[in-house]
Amino acid sequence: RVFVAGHRGMVGAACVRRLASEDCEILIATREDADLRRQDETEEWVRMAKPDVVIVAAATVGGILANSTRPAEFLYDNLVIESNLIEAAHKAGVAKLLFLGSSCIYPKLAEQPMREDALLTGPLEPTNEWYAIAKIAGIKLCQAYRRQHGSDFISAMPANLYGPGDNFDLQSSHVVPALIRKIDAAKQAGQATAEIWGSGKPKREFLHVDDLADALVYLLKFY
């Protein structure tokens, strides 16, 4: 029994698609079933559903503009969602939990290509530090439960994702869907150029969300 928290998001939906080919029962919870920002509702739902595995793909996400204009929402929502799910899984005796981190957890000036041991070695990228701080807290919370309780709670840090179910809203989208929409809009309007934010200097590594789902299933089985 695998509970995919955040099944409506791009990563969660990819996990549901991938798990459909596995010998498991997929569990999902809508906002009406449980508001994951509420500890009591989250713990009650997990206790009643009795999952063996929890995938924490639920999060408040967005691009540079969303991060910069809604910092409190990004920090608060993500802190409480991950904390509620991890504590609920612990209390319910869940056998394994997989928390989804993010590549933005690494320092802005981390050596390229980035290594896992670069975490917490320097200042974060200011444009998404609120989301990054919440993700770092989730990673450390899983480590703390492993150390204190022996819980099999692990974390995975995907690269920049794209694929089915992506967000194309220019106010909150990530770089790939934003580029696609801007270039398509320019082409449709017969414009010779399209405005792209940033300096063009940052290095990105992109990963299709279905490839991530394959990797996550592998981690659940063998890590």
Q: Where are the predicted features?
A:
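Adenosine-cofactor binding site in Rossmann-like domains, unifying the SAM/SAH pocket
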Residues: 20-44
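Flexible, glycine-rich beta-alpha linker
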Residues: 35, 105-107, 130, 154-178, ...
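Active-site Tyr-X1-5-Lys
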Residues: 126-159, 175-189
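NAD(P)H-binding glycine-rich loop region in Rossmannoid oxidoreductase-like domains
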Residues: 39-79, 88-91, 108
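N-terminal Rossmann NAD(P)H-binding glycine-rich loop of SDR-like oxidoreductase domains
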Residues: 1-21
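Conserved catalytic-site region of short-chain dehydrogenase/reductase
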Residues: 63-64, 99-114, 130-136, 147-148, ...
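Conserved Rossmann-fold NAD(P)-dependent oxidoreductase catalytic core, especially the SDR/UDP-sugar
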Residues: 83-128, 154
